[in-house]
Amino acid sequence: MERKVHIIPYQVIKQEQQVNEIPRGVEMIQAPAVWNQTRGRGVKVAVLDTGCDADHPDLKARIIGGRNFTDDDEGDPEIFKDYNGHGTHVAGTIAATENENGVVGVAPEADLLIIKVLNKQGSGQYDWIIQGIYYAIEQKVDIISMSLGGPEDVPELHEAVKKAVASQILVMCAAGNEGDGDDRTDELGYPGCYNEVISVGAINFDRHASEFSNSNNEVDLVAPGEDILSTVPGGKYATFSGTSMATPHVAGALALIKQLANASFERDLTEPELYAQLIKRTIPLGNSPKMEGNGLLYLTAVEELSRIFDTQRVAGILSTASLKVK
């Protein structure tokens, strides 16, 4: 199968030698507000991308293994080094360790399994992606994150995705960056357009839909995707933009949600149940569902709605009590 898939095109804004901050995207989705309850501990996230810098100080404690399915390094399966930068950036947004330097990921105690399916040019064969998904299933991961896509609906790829979901794995993918800002025109990319996949669009820090973000009926939600600071090879940091950057926010969030929900329900939730828990934690932004799906990922949405309800309930009780006094 010689047909090609690529990293979702993205823009490099700037690179930095050193930083020490919680990235704005992590803050925007309210991840720090739930870290006292959950940090993603024990949740295994497979990152299907260009590999990863396993020696990056913000990532090395989180990486539990890796596998190479590309033609880089003469196809050596044991070498999953990132020569591109894209995969390392994605991994950092998901689970960069909280330490005294660098950045912090959405789920700073989640485990990362690096599955290299795109080569140094950011390109790969559909076979590599398919093999990577089956490897993730074999390794019993909880979440698969893919910031990649191609124009073709390949049945074998769809079948691999279905098998992952049937194995109770949450599969998410970037919606794509071919958008024109018009929700009346659809831009389709695969595997993001498969119904079984959680398709992630992008917004900016003003909560406006990113013009480049694909619009179609399969978009599930949106997350920050412009000017996203994260890790890059060589122990450095960089700011990228794209739906590729939005997707790992959702992967990290699901690691947080899975740990929290499983503890609350005292059992392992199924893939559909965890998807429902994710969608409960979104807020509408007023765009077409083709642009934003269910809305912006917002991890404290449930608690904030509960507070509003409690305030209204108390106000109602006080109002009733006043009437009785009269």
From Swiss-Prot:
One example of a Gene Ontology biological process annotation? proteolysis
Q: Which InterPro entries match?
A: Peptidase_S8/S53_dom, Peptidase_S8/S53_dom_sf, Peptidase_S8/S53_subtilisin, Peptidase_S8_Asp-AS, Peptidase_S8_His-AS, Peptidase_S8_Ser-AS, Peptidase_S8_subtilisin-rel, Subtilisin_Carlsberg-like
Q: Which UniProt keywords apply?
A: Hydrolase, Protease, Serine protease
Q: Which GO terms describe its molecular function?
A: serine-type endopeptidase activity
Keyword check for Zinc = no
Query: Protease among the record's keywords?
Result: yes
Q: Superkingdom, according to UniProt?
A: Bacteria
Q: What is its EC number?
A: 3.4.21.-
**Top-level class of the enzyme under EC nomenclature:** hydrolase
Q: Where is the Peptidase S8 domain?
A: 23-303
Active-site residues (renumbered) = D49, H86, S244
Hey, which family's this protein in?
Belongs to the peptidase S8 family.
The record's PANTHER family line, in alphabetical order, gives: CELL WALL-ASSOCIATED PROTEASE (PTHR43399:SF4), SUBTILISIN-RELATED (PTHR43399)
Give the protein's biological function: Involved in the generation of beta- and alpha-amylases from the large amylase precursor.
Q: What is this protein called?
A: Intracellular serine protease
- The species this protein was found in: Paenibacillus polymyxa (Bacillus polymyxa)
